[in-house]
Amino acid sequence: MSSGTENDQFYSFDESDSSSIELYESHNTSEFTIHGLVFPKLISVTSQDSEFDINEDEDGVDTIYEGMLDAPLTKNNKRILCEGSVPNLSYECLTTKGIFERMLQRVDHLQPIFAIPSADILILLQHYDWNEERLLEVWTEKMDELLVELGLSTTANIKKDNDYNSHFREVEFKNDFTCIICCDKKDTETFALECGHEYCINCYRHYIKDKLHEGNIITCMDCSLALKNEDIDKVMGHPSSSKLMDSSIKSFVQKHNRNYKWCPFADCKSIVHLRDTSSLPEYTRLHYSPFVKCNSFHRFCFNCGFEVHSPADCKITTAWVKKARKESEILNWVLSHTKECPKCSVNIEKNGGCNHMVCSSCKYEFCWICEGPWAPHGKNFFQCTMYKNNEDNKSKNPQDANKTLKKYTFYYRLFNEHEVSAKLDWNLGQTLGTKVHALQERIGISWIDGQFLSESLKVLNEGRTVLKWSFAVAYYSDASHNLTKIFVDNQMLLANAVESLSELLQIKTPEVIMKRRPEFYNKAGYVENRTTALMECGRELLCKGICKAAE
C-alpha cells in the first residue's frame, strides 16, 4: 500500500479478490472518489425527516452541519460496496407538551363513548397501558365494576350519613378537629372526598407527596375513591399534579416505544416520533443505524438509544458498551487523564484534545495514545491505532483470556482517548470561538467569514466520534482478513487527519486563527472525506460477517 499527500491518495486492490475494495482519491483537490462516486471535498448532510441537503456558502465551500453521508455506494458495472439500500426515515421531534396533547386527542376520541370526565378516561387509558381495544372491551362488559375498581365511582363510596357531601373535595377550616392519623386535636384545615374520610391538611399533604413519586393513581387514605388532579393541587397548595402528568407521559411513551423514543442525552426531555417503523428491520439487515436528531440537536440511534455510533452497528455497539461497563471507574479516569512521560517519568495530566504532548520537564515530544516519539507520527500513518499481535501469541489458544484482555485494553484505551479528546477539543473550540467573535466585532469581520471555526469544530467532533467507534469495530473484527487490514489503514489516515486539524485549535491568538482560515477549511475537508471512507469500509466488514459480536 502506498501513501501520498492529503490531496493525492491512491489505494487499489485486486477487484477479483472478493474481500477487497478499491478506494482512491482524485487528484482534483475539490473532490474525492470512492468506488467511482465523486464527492465534493466538504459534504454537508442535514436531516429533516432524513432528506439530505448539500449546502454551499458564499465562498464556495460546503458547510458542515450534523451528519456524514450514510448511504450505500453504487457503481455501474462494478461490484457494490455493500448490497442494498434503506428508505428514508420520516420522524418528528416533540416536547412533553406535544405528547400530552396527543394523549388528550385519544381521550377526546373516547369521550362520546364513555360519557365520563376526561380526567377519568385518562386514568382508564393509563391503567390499561393505552390499549384502547382492551379498555373498550372491558368497559362494555362491566362498566360499573371498572369504575368502582379504579376509584372513579363516587356513588359506590359516598357515606350516606355524613355531613361532608355538600363540601366534598374542598379544603375547609375546622376548630378542635381530631385527625385519626396524627391523633392531634387542633384548629386546622381539613380535606375529604365524597366518602367522608376526613383528615388534617398536613397528613394529607404528606400522604400525597409520598404517592406522587410512585406515579400511580392516588386514592383516599381509607378507601378506593380516587383523587383528581385538581384535588391534589388544592391539598398541596400549588400545582403538584404535574408530576402525575409526567408519569402518564412516561407511561404513554413506554407503551408506544416502537414509535416514540426519549432523547438519551442528560437533562434532555425531547421525544422523537418515528412515523413508520416498517423500514427498521431493513436498517438492521444492511447494518445501517437509524440516526435521528431531537429538538436540542442531539443525534442518537433510534434503534438502540445510544449516541451516533458509525461505523459500528447497533449489535456491535451494545456488545461494546456492555463490556465497557465492567471496567473500573477509577481505571477509566486514570487512562483518560494521566500518564508518565516515557522519558523522565514525570506525571502528566492532559488538558487539551490534541494528542501531541510535550513534557514540561524534559521537553520530550511524544504521542499521548501510544506513548511513542512524536516525530514518526508526522509521516505516513498513525501507527498507534494498529493492534499488534505478539509473535508468542500465535502459538497460544486464540481463546486465551489474557490475550483477549490485552486486545480489549488496547482498543478500549484508544476508544477512551478519542472520547476524552473530543470533549477537550470542543471546549477549547468554544473558547477560541468566543475570542474570534470578539475579534470580528472589533475589526468588522463578517459573520460568514467567522464560521469556519465552528464548522471545522463540528467536522472534528464527528471525525473523532467515528474514529472512536471504529475501535469497537476493529476489536470484533477478524484481524487476519485483508479487509480488516484495509479498515485499519483507513483508521490511520483518519487519525492523522483528526490530529492535524486538532493541532490548529492549539493556536491561541485570534488574529493568527483568522489568517489560517483556508488551512482550517482544507484540513476539515480532508477529515470529512476520510470519515466517510472509514464508515463505508466498516460497514462492509459488517455486511460480510468479518466483524461480529459473540452471541
Curated annotation (Swiss-Prot):
Protein name: E3 ubiquitin-protein ligase HEL1
UniProt cross-references to Gene3D superfamilies, sorted A to Z: 1.20.120.1750, Zinc/RING finger domain, C3HC4 (zinc finger) (3.30.40.10)
Residue ranges covered by zinc fingers (IBR-type): 242-314
EC number: 2.3.2.31
Binding positions (Zn(2+) 4): C367, C370, H377, C384
Gene that this polypeptide is encoded by: HEL1
Organism encoding this protein: Saccharomyces cerevisiae (strain ATCC 204508 / S288c) (Baker's yeast)
InterPro entries to which the protein is assigned, alphabetical: Ariadne, ARIH1-like_UBL, E3_UB_ligase_RBR, IBR_dom, TRIAD_supradom, Znf_C3HC4_RING-type, Znf_RING, Znf_RING/FYVE/PHD
Residues binding Zn(2+) 3: C341, C344, C359, C362
Quaternary state and interactors: Interacts with the E2 ubiquitin-conjugating enzyme UBC4 and histones H3 and H4.
Residues given in the record as Zn(2+) 1 binding sites: C179, C182, C200, C203
